[in-house]
Amino acid sequence: MSKSTIRIATRQSPLAMWQALYVKEQLQIAHPSLVVELVPMVTKGDIILDTPLAKVGGKGLFVKELELALLSSRADIAVHSMKDVPIDFPEGLGLVTICEREDPRDAFVSNHYDSLEQLPAGSVVGTSSLRRQCQLKALRPDLIIRDLRGNVGTRLSKLDNGDYDAIILAVAGLKRLKLTERIRSSLSAEQSLPAVGQGAVGIECRLDDHDTQALLAALNHADTATCVKAERAMNTRLEGGCQVPIGSYAIWQNGKIWLRALVGSPDGETILRGERLVSPEDAEQAGISLAEELLDKGAREILTAVYQGNTAI
């Protein structure tokens, strides 16, 4: 292999750095002589912390600066949390590797209550996600949902300071940061369907950089990739972004792919759901047909209202 060094573009948050260091470690296990360097940077999503994500607008809030580093050859690969990766890529770039998925569920985190069911009426729950908000409001319309921004540590500090009675975070992020003890319970997919790609780490690079792609091949987890691609196919057909009330989750079940999806109004009053059970080779097409089913049920109207800023969070 002619390439001796790989530079990884990454956000500077603790969780993003964990992901980049994980990819570095896996690359060096697969290729012991390879030199791997990190190129930390700050994204728009890291800077704008006083506005709910759904109102910031635009796609790629957490990836654009990393992609510019790839296009200018300041980095060879960019490591992303798959739930933050937009459906479209700049010309010349693409998603080439999806690593094995961690637990994709949402975590219920509280200092006083063990579960969502235990929260008294009127409790304040923090989340920056319209996907989580719509499902929480559908389950518990008596709760008050308030915006919660910042990295994992910042969000936990706000909980500890008494700003919230509970917050919802990703199980995967808490596990990776060795904060599992903060998880009071994990929400089932029936309670809170995960985001597209949640729990998976993806690697983006220049499509003409075949040497780098060859090095990355060892990190691709085929079973995870099949599931995430089905979820993303659904999201692509819906023309969904990362900050919209869309959930999609695929798992392997007896050799087939079970794909579930939802689109919800932010107030939780309307939740459109659908599912498919298909052979792996049909997984992406199933994502498309599932999206079309949701569109037929009224998903377009819900998403249009969200894009126009009619959100409650």
Swiss-Prot record:
Q: Name one GO biological process term.
A: protoporphyrinogen IX biosynthetic process
Which EC class is this protein assigned? transferase
What the entry lists under SUPFAM superfamilies is as follows: Periplasmic binding protein-like II, Porphobilinogen deaminase (hydroxymethylbilane synthase), C-terminal domain
Q: Please give the cofactor(s) recorded in the UniProt entry for this protein.
A: dipyrromethane
Name the InterPro entries for this protein.
HemC, Porphobilin_deaminase_cofac_BS, Porphobilin_deaminase_N, Porphobilinogen_deaminase_C, Porphobilinogen_deaminase_C_sf
Q: Which Pfam families match?
A: Porphobil_deam, Porphobil_deamC
Molecular-function GO terms, alphabetical? hydroxymethylbilane synthase activity
- Put simply, this protein is called Porphobilinogen deaminase
Organism whose genome encodes this protein: Proteus mirabilis (strain HI4320)
Source organism lineage?
A: Bacteria, Pseudomonadati, Pseudomonadota, Gammaproteobacteria, Enterobacterales
GN (gene name)? hemC
